[in-house]
From Swiss-Prot:
Species this protein is from: Bos taurus
Assigned protein family: Belongs to the TRAFAC class translation factor GTPase superfamily. Classic translation factor GTPase family. LepA subfamily.
SUPFAM superfamilies: EF-G C-terminal domain-like, P-loop containing nucleoside triphosphate hydrolases, Translation proteins
Main location: mitochondrion
UniProt binding sites for GTP: 75-82, 140-144, 194-197
Subcellular location: Mitochondrion inner membrane
PROSITE patterns linked to this entry: G_TR_1 (PS00301), G_TR_2 (PS51722)
One Gene Ontology term from the biological process aspect of the record: translation
Name of the protein described by the UniProt record: Translation factor GUF1, mitochondrial
Entries under InterPro entries matching the protein: EF-4 (IPR006297), EFG_III/V (IPR035647), EFG_V-like (IPR000640), EFTu-like_2 (IPR004161), G_TR_CS (IPR031157), LepA_C_sf (IPR038363), LepA_CTD (IPR013842), LepA_IV (IPR035654)
Gene3D superfamilies noted in UniProt: 3.30.70.240, Elongation factor 4, C-terminal domain, Elongation Factor G (Translational Gtpase), domain 3, P-loop containing nucleotide triphosphate hydrolases, Translation factors
Length: 669
């Protein structure tokens, strides 16, 4: 053999050909040779590369409407929604049972890092119950108050919910809010008491809380441990028994509700749809009721929990649909899709998300403007609750004014921009949307409305132009151990809150309801509440409209010039404390100049706070080694006159780093 290898490359090829032929005849490895005359010999060779077309497709016609259940899991933060979803996926065989099954449906990096659910996720589960095969469509929802819009969207595709409550912590503020979301949507509610394996768990106490607050009989509660898998199977049985099947008909024309969507840079928009009527399959031509554009369906399927293509989707089922939508504005959440030339009455959509917090967003480097614009457009498709307006700043350049549902929502959006699109941004101090009622017909004609909304403090109108200012208010719910009630009530009073209700939900826990001005809770209220209650209190709020308020626009001046980026709107009673704090932070952030810098907070022409950045000072007396004192005084006087002149002609340039530092400290306060 070695002589063949040494005779040149062609002899090596001859050897390879001989080995191949010998292997085929079974001379080298007889046990691997195919048996003659068998099916193995006549069968075409298998393809050894992957192909999307060869995916095994599920026949969804096997699941009639009567055997379909659509449900969500709702709960307060960290009460075990995602863990329960993991166990349900394991029980139904959607995923293998391994120790690594943690937050399977939480696919975003930010969700895994923070241990929270941000995006509602769907999974279709196939479950055999009493000899029948059922299709259970599960939607895992977020628990934080900032993402309640995600919850309400998810509930529109469901007929029932699992209301998960921690057996140790009991009912919390977001539990109450989520219950009423499901109750108002007239969904079947199955209470599930989780974490019964904990040492301090008291499921009987929680059962009584559920009975008292929600008026649900205690015997309807299911006690489980999602972590250990204890009694989880009874949850699936209850879903089938207690949640009704969707009222849908395959014979009717197609009506599909788009309740969520994601963007894939290769396949375009992937729309999550709930079919209320009809059937949709690959090749169908569909029309968007919102844009009236026509598309051809490229792929339909279910999430199990990963994408699983199917031949068709039928009425009552929940799945995904890809139809060549390349523009991020084409997939509107709440839109109705129907078959071409078969128009239908559009389904009622969703209330548009109402931004509670606005902040300016600018690229760190203006050369990255177009990349950041593209990233924001794609991310707002996945998160349609973000409102975007173009904005510009003298110091920070071109950017946007973005509206968010809360501070956590803003932080998560910023983190997703960095992680998913590698975009670095500057975020300004968050503000809330105020309103002003204009005083004259001339102004009403100019603005085209009597009541204007102000999302940028720099555009806050002067008092002479308005009859009254309005600020947004929210109805807040606080649930706390009774030992912290006094401290929390004092905190609420300091935030200008008005008490509306107070009730004991059991012997040791109190539920307080307050009407808060939104700007008093938007930055640091939650942190203060947790600090005062040693982490035990929970907080949730809902929009309660607007109320009249004494608001003032506070300008920040550097040597008499207004810095627009630091203009803020505050309540008259808090103007001094807020102004002084901003001046102090700016003093620590600004670099010293050759002249003195006066940092002032002003309400109109009235200065209410001031800090001074001292000038660099040259020692002009260094060359004087004694002599007459008048010589020294003359030099010092000349230096002072020069500094005064320099201050008049010198413009204070605020470095971008100083802006970032001041704005970040203000929002982290």
């Amino acid at each position: 053999m070695w002589t063949l290898a040494g005779q040149g490359w062609w002899r090596g090829r001859a050897l390879a050909a001989w080995v191949t032929e010998a292997a085929r005849k079974g001379l080298l490895w007889p046990h691997l040779a195919p048996a003659r005359g068998t099916a193995a010999e006549s069968r075409a060779p298998d393809r050894c590369y992957s192909s999307a077309d060869r995916k095994e497709k599920i026949d969804m016609s096997c699941f009639p409407v009567e055997n379909t259940r659509n449900f969500s899991i709702i709960a307060h933060v960290d009460h075990g929604k995602s863990t329960l979803a993991d166990r349900l996926l394991e029980l139904t065989g959607a995923i293998d049972k391994t120790k690594n099954n943690k937050q399977v449906l939480d696919k975003l990096q930010v969700e895994r890092e923070r241990g929270i659910t941000v995006k509602a996720q769907t999974a279709s589960l196939f479950y055999n119950y009493e000899g029948k095969q059922y299709l259970l469509n599960l939607i895992d929802t977020p628990g934080h108050v900032d993402f309640s819009y995600e919850v309400s969207r998810s509930l529109s595709a469901c007929q029932g919910v699992l209301l998960v409550v921690d057996a140790n912590e009991g009912i919390q503020a977001q539990t109450v809010a989520n219950f009423f979301l499901a109750f108002e949507a007239q969904l079947s509610i199955i209470p599930v008491i989780n974490k019964i394996d904990l040492k301090n768990a008291d499921p009987e106490r929680v059962e009584k809380q559920i009975e008292k607050v929600f008026d649900i009989p205690g015997d309807e509660c299911i006690k489980i441990s999602a972590k250990l898998g204890t009694n989880v199977e009874s949850v699936l049985d209850a879903v089938i028994k207690r949640i009704p099947f969707p009222k849908a008909h395959c014979r009717n024309p197609l009506r599909a509700l788009v309740f969520d969507s994601t963007f894939d840079q290769y396949r375009g928009v992937i729309a999550n749809v709930a079919l209320f009527d009809g059937v949709v399959s690959k090749g169908d031509k569909i029309v968007s009721a919102h844009t009236q554009k026509t598309y051809e369906v490229n792929e339909v399927g279910v999430l199990n929990p990963n994408e699983q293509p199917t031949h068709k989707l039928y009425a009552g089922q929940v799945g995904y649909l890809i139809a060549g939508m390349k523009d991020v504005t084409e997939a509107q959440i709440g839109d109705t899709l129907y078959l071409h030339k078969q128009p239908v009455e559009p389904l009622p959509g969703f209330k548009s998300a109402k931004p509670m917090v606005f902040a300016g967003m600018y690229p760190v480097d203006q050369s990255e403007y177009n990349n950041l614009k593209s990233a924001i457009e794609k991310l707002t498709l996945n998160d349609s609750s973000v409102v975007v307006h173009r904005d510009s700043s003298l110091a920070l350049g071109a950017g946007w004014r973005l509206g968010f549902l809360g501070l956590l929502h803003m932080e998560v959006f910023n983190q997703r921009l960095e992680q998913e699109y590698n975009a670095s941004v500057i975020l300004t101090t968050p503000t809330v949307p105020y309103k002003a009622v204009l005083s004259s017909a001339k102004l009403i004609k100019e603005y085209r409305e009597k009541e204007i909304t102000i999302i940028n403090p720099a555009q806050f109108p002067d008092k002479s132009k308005v009859t009254e200012y309005l600020e947004p208010v929210v109805l807040g719910t606080i649930i706390t151990p009774d030992e912290y009630t006094g401290k929390i009530m004092m905190l609420c009073q300091a935030r200008r809150a008005v008490q509306k209700n107070m009730m004991y939900i059991d012997q040791n826990r109190v539920m307080l309801k307050y009407l808060f001005p939104l700007n008093e809770i938007v930055v640091d209220f939650y942190d203060s509440l947790k600090s005062l209650s040693s982490g035990y209190a929970s907080f949730d709020y809902e929009d309660a409209g607007y109320q009249t308020a004494e608001l003032v626009k506070m300008d920040i001046l550097l040597n008499g010039s207004i810095v627009e980026e630091l203009v803020t709107v505050v309540h008259k009673d808090k103007a001094y404390s807020v102004g002084k704090a901003i001046c102090e932070r700016l003093k620590d952030s600004l670099p010293r100049q050759l002249f003195e810098i006066a940092i002032q907070a002003a309400l109109g022409s009235k200065i209410i706070a001031r800090e001074t950045v001292k000038a660099y000072r040259k020692n002009v007396l260094a060359k004087c080694y004694g002599g007459d004192i008048t010589r020294k005084m003359k030099l010092l006087k000349r230096q002072a006159e020069g500094k005064k002149k320099l201050r008049k002609v010198g413009n204070v340039e605020v470095p971008k780093d100083a802006f970032i530092k001041v704005l970040k400290t203000q929002s982290d306060k």
